[in-house]
Amino acid sequence: YIMELELSIIDYTSPFYEAVLSLRNDILRRPLGLNLYEEDLHEDRDQYIVIAVMEHQLQACLMLKILDHITVKIRQMAVATSMQHKGVGLMIMTYAETFCALNNYTIVELHARKTAVGFYKKLGYQTDGIEFEEVGIPHVKMTKNLS
């Protein structure tokens, strides 16, 4: 039933934006004892938002931040708990990469939580191996060349 997922690109003016904030908070912040709504969300306005919707409900999202004319950073990928381990992350990442490639961006980078490094490696991302802390947990920078 994953095939019923509709993927699209929105921005912060979309009616889905509130659901995007809620999902990011529930999946990425609340388990760490943090609150997304206390963060500065201004830069969301300059980013593309990739969403996966099924039956009018947001199931997954990620943020695309343009760094320069060839580089995009993927941020805050979140998949609803009920949809995890069903290929949704793969679908939304593939959709995001296709969008980047079609718009002539050739490098995608991201800061992966250590627990997610294996997932991104399967998608062809490589790490420099240097660990750092973000939101209080270990991350590594990963990159993929789309060209």
Label the predicted regions:
Residues 4-20:
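A short beta-loop-alpha structural element at the N-terminal edge
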Residues 25-59:
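Active-site rim helix/loop that mediates acceptor-substrate recognition in acyltransferases
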Residues 51, 57-66, 73-78:
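Conserved beta-strand in the GNAT
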Residues 66-77, 84, 134-138:
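A conserved beta-turn-beta hairpin within the catalytic core of GNAT-like acetyltransferases
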Residues 79, 85-98:
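Conserved acetyl-CoA-binding loop-helix of GNAT-fold acetyltransferases
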Residues 80, 113:
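Residue-level recognition of the GNAT/N-acetyltransferase active site
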Residues 93, 100-112:
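Conserved GNAT acetyl-CoA-binding A-motif
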